[in-house]
A protein has these predicted regions:
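Short, well-ordered amphipathic alpha-helical segments that serve as non-catalytic structural scaffolds
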Residues: 32, 133, 228-232
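Short beta-strand micro-motifs within the conserved protein kinase catalytic domain, predominantly
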Residues: 150-157
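ATP-dependent phospho-/nucleotidyl transfer catalytic cores
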Residues: 127, 157-259
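Detector for Asparagine
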Residues: 32, 40, 80, 154, ...
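Phosphate-handling architecture centered on phosphoinositide signaling
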Residues: 1-126, 135-136, 140-144, 148-149, ...
């Protein structure tokens, strides 16, 4: 298993380095053994305090280059530039034997520059719901993030009432959002927008990445020689988004909550 940090290093302008903040008496309570084996993750991570030390100790590999991502988005029909990872941290990327690269992302990791006065924590109730729901979606053949492991704690997190705190590590082929691109477009930081597109194409659309000025070619058919590649990649983006929308609508999936 090789842990890499391509997003954090290649797009350093789009992230903030954040040290994960542990909850008290953190305990590993659930592990997705099959997913860990798929990515050849070290078995000693999932015994006793192994992965907890990897995230939170000074010697641990997982927390050393943890970053929070900056992005914007639309809320209640209005553009909001003040979003970002308010309680989650990208720990790095790992690959399986087939070359598929997935992010490791810690949720409930504490405050970040994008927490907007929130505590950056997650509660047991919603964390368990996400853990089970993500795996259920995956095994139903519906595109989703995956649940790698979950931690419980006796530390109380205050919502409407005090609740037990929790954390989880989820995995996904990408944590890129439309809001990443929207933020740098609206802020007119076009150099960063170009770098973001380069990264996206290299990781997710390598055929298009081999073209001259691929990040521009994907969105603007300015050269006849690349027109077929452009159309194909736009078709793939549309196709993948359509698949997700179709199955979510069939299941009455609303606003990232499971009911």
């Amino acid at each position: 298993m090789q842990l890499s940090h391509h997003y954090a290093t290649d797009l350093s302008e789009t992230v903030s380095a954040v040290t994960p903040q542990p909850l008290s008496d953190l305990t590993l309570c659930l592990t997705n053994t099959a997913l860990a084996e798929q990515f050849n993750l070290p078995t000693d991570w999932f015994t006793d305090q192994g992965i907890i030390e990897q995230i939170f100790s000074e010697q641990g590999a997982l927390g050393k280059q943890a970053v929070a991502q900056k992005y914007g988005g639309h809320q209640f029909g209005q553009w909001n530039p003040y979003l970002g990872d308010g309680r989650g941290l990208l720990l790095g990327e790992v690959s399986d034997d087939k070359g598929a690269q997935f992010d490791l992302h810690l949720k409930g990791a504490g405050q970040t520059p994008y927490s907007r006065h929130a505590d950056g924590r997650a509660v047991l109730r919603s964390t368990l719901r996400e853990y089970i729901g993500s795996e259920a979606l995956h095994h139903l053949g519906i595109p989703s993030s995956r649940s790698l492991c979950m931690f419980t704690s006796n530390e109380r997190v205050y919502r409407e009432l005090p609740e037990p705190g929790a954390m989880m590590i989820r995995m996904a082929s990408s944590h890129l959002r439309f809001g990443h691109f929207e933020y740098y477009f609206h802020s007119k930081e076009f150099d960063i927008l170009d770098k973001l597109m380069d990264f996206t194409l290299t990781r997710h659309f390598p055929d298009c990445a081999s073209q001259t000025e691929p990040h521009k070619a994907l969105l603007k058919a300015s050269e006849e020689a690349t027109a077929s590649v452009i159309k194909e990649n736009l078709r793939l983006i549309h196709q993948e988004q359509s698949k997700i929308m179709e199955v979510f609508r069939c299941l009455h999936f609303i606003n990232t909550f499971f009911f």
